[in-house]
């Protein structure tokens, strides 16, 4: 327990908050270029082929980002927008690609939850 004199000499240091998405550099989204598009398998007990991409960001970082939804048109040199948000069963994947912006097209034939997958309202 410090004395009052010690507290006057040097105040208590605030605990620094560690960000969960450092590559965004405090921005809500970042633009980047895909360097590799591939599939990977999740941790136990899940089993699938999850679509992910290595993305070189404008902030200088190279990160792994998840491609949500069924089917995608991304390939090497595609320009994408990424947001924060990890994928729980893929270690090291802390970002999501935003569908329906830049080169990432929205999910085809999506009827519900369209805004999350960049799909326009279907004509009736």
UniProtKB/Swiss-Prot annotation:
GO BP terms, alphabetized: translation
Region Disordered: start-end pairs: 1-28, 101-124
Gene3D superfamilies linked to this entry: Nucleic acid-binding proteins
One Pfam short name: Ribosom_S12_S23
The protein's name: Small ribosomal subunit protein uS12
InterPro entries (alphabetical): NA-bd_OB-fold, Ribosomal_uS12, Ribosomal_uS12_bac
Family: Belongs to the universal ribosomal protein uS12 family.
Function: With S4 and S5 plays an important role in translational accuracy.
Biased composition (Basic residues): 113-124
Source organism superkingdom: Bacteria
UniProtKB keywords: Methylation, Ribonucleoprotein, Ribosomal protein, RNA-binding, rRNA-binding, tRNA-binding
Modification type 3-methylthioaspartic acid: residues: 89
GO cellular component, one term: small ribosomal subunit
Gene Ontology MF terms in the entry: rRNA binding; structural constituent of ribosome; tRNA binding
Complex and partners: Part of the 30S ribosomal subunit. Contacts proteins S8 and S17. May interact with IF1 in the 30S initiation complex.
Taxonomic source organism: Crocosphaera subtropica (strain ATCC 51142 / BH68)
S-S bridge residues: none
